[in-house]
C-alpha cells in the first residue's frame, strides 16, 4: 500500500502516539476508521455492511462522511505521511514488533478492530515509517477458519494469508483498487461428485475475503 498523508494535528498529549482522537465529525477515531474499512467493502458485500452499520449504531451518511474525510486526509498536499493518518484515528498500537521479510526487517504494528474481535488491523512499515502494507489479519490466539472447499469461503470469514495457506500454490494478482487484493487458486468444490477442483479468483478488501470470481 502506498504511503499515506495526513493534515491532522497531533492527537493527545503525546502527539500521534497518544490515545486515539475523535474524527472531525465527533465520532470516536476507531469507529470512524472502521467506517473507512467498510466503505470499500460495500462495493461487494452491501448487505454485510448494512448489518455492520446497525451493529455500530451509525448510518450510511456517517460511513460516507468518514470515508470522505479519510480520502481528503490521505491526499492532502504537503501533509505528513506514513503512519500518522492511522495513529490519528487509532491511537497507540496494541503491539509493535520487528518482522523479517527475506533480507529486510520491517516493523509490524497492530490495533484491535471491535467489529471483528478475532482480527487485528496490521501495518507494516519500512525505514522512516513508510507504510508498506495495511490490512486485516487474524489476532494472535484466535482460531482460524477451516478452509477445505469453496463452501468454506464465506465472505468476511478469512484473510489473504489464510486462503493462500489453505490452497497452495495461490498466485497473487493485482487488485482493482489500492485496498484490494486477489489470489488465483484452485479450490475443491463442496461435492466430490461434482467434478475436480475449480480454478477461481478470491478477492479481498483490506485483507478480508469478499467474494469468489469464476
What annotation goes with each model-predicted range?
Residues 2-182, 204-214:
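Short helix/turn-capping signatures at newly exposed starts of structured segments
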Residues 186-214:
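C-terminal structured interaction module
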Amino acid at each position: 500500500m502506498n504511503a499515506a498523508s495526513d493534515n491532522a494535528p497531533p492527537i493527545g498529549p503525546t502527539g500521534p502516539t497518544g490515545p486515539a482522537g475523535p474524527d472531525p465529525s465527533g465520532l470516536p477515531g476507531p469507529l470512524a476508521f472502521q467506517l473507512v474499512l467498510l466503505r470499500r467493502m460495500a462495493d461487494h458485500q452491501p448487505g454485510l455492511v448494512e448489518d455492520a452499520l446497525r451493529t455500530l449504531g451509525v448510518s450510511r451518511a456517517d460511513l460516507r462522511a468518514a470515508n470522505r474525510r479519510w480520502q481528503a486526509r490521505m491526499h492532502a498536499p504537503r501533509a505528513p505521511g506514513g503512519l500518522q493518518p492511522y495513529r490519528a484515528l487509532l491511537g497507540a498500537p496494541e503491539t509493535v514488533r520487528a518482522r523479517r521479510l527475506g533480507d529486510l526487517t520491517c516493523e509490524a504494528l497492530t490495533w484491535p478492530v471491535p467489529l471483528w474481535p478475532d482480527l487485528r488491523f496490521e501495518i507494516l512499515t519500512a525505514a522512516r515509517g513508510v507504510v508498506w502494507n495495511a490490512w486485516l489479519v487474524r489476532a494472535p490466539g484466535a482460531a482460524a477458519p477451516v478452509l477445505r472447499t469453496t463452501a468454506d469461503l464465506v465472505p468476511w470469514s478469512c484473510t489473504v494469508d489464510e486462503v493462500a495457506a489453505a490452497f497452495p500454490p495461490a498466485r497473487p494478482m493485482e487488485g482493482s483498487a489500492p485496498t484490494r487484493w486477489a489470489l488465483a487458486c484452485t479450490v475443491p468444490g463442496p461435492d466430490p461428485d461434482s467434478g475436480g477442483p475449480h480454478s477461481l479468483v478470491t478477492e479481498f478488501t483490506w485483507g478480508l475475503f469478499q467474494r469468489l470470481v469464476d
